[in-house]
């Protein structure tokens, strides 16, 4: 897997995370609106709307921070998955070379003391 493939995976993960976050925020905002309408009377609507706008603006900031954290997490997970895959490959290569070096015939060949087959 080369750098372009890794970048593509990271972008796909970012898009997926952003979509999930947007869906969750939309669900949260719609449920918040229903609760506000159900719980409070018409007389306090103006006060509540101003308060709700303030809360929603704070939620937007938290949402942006959350998106940033989710993106970083997705990138980190993609990089870690790639790292684990590469480490597995390196482990397999090391085991292969250890097997070759453990072979007495090859060891002698490398030192110049082996006999041809």
Curated annotation (Swiss-Prot):
Protein name per UniProt: Uncharacterized protein C664.13
Compartments, record wording: Cytoplasm; Nucleus
Keyword vocabulary terms for this entry: Cytoplasm, Nucleus
GO cellular component labels: cytosol; nucleus
């Amino acid at each position: 897997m080369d750098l372009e493939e890794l970048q593509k995976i990271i972008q796909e993960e970012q898009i997926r995370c952003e979509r999930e976050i947007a869906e969750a925020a939309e669900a949260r905002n719609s449920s918040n609106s229903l609760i506000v309408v159900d719980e409070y009377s018409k007389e306090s609507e103006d006060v509540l709307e101003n308060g709700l706008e303030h809360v929603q603006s704070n939620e937007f900031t938290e949402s942006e921070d959350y998106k940033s954290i989710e993106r970083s997490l997705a990138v980190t997970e993609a990089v870690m998955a790639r790292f684990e895959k590469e480490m597995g490959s390196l482990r397999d290569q090391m085991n292969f070379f250890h097997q070759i070096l453990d072979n007495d015939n090859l060891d002698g060949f490398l030192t110049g003391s082996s006999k041809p087959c």
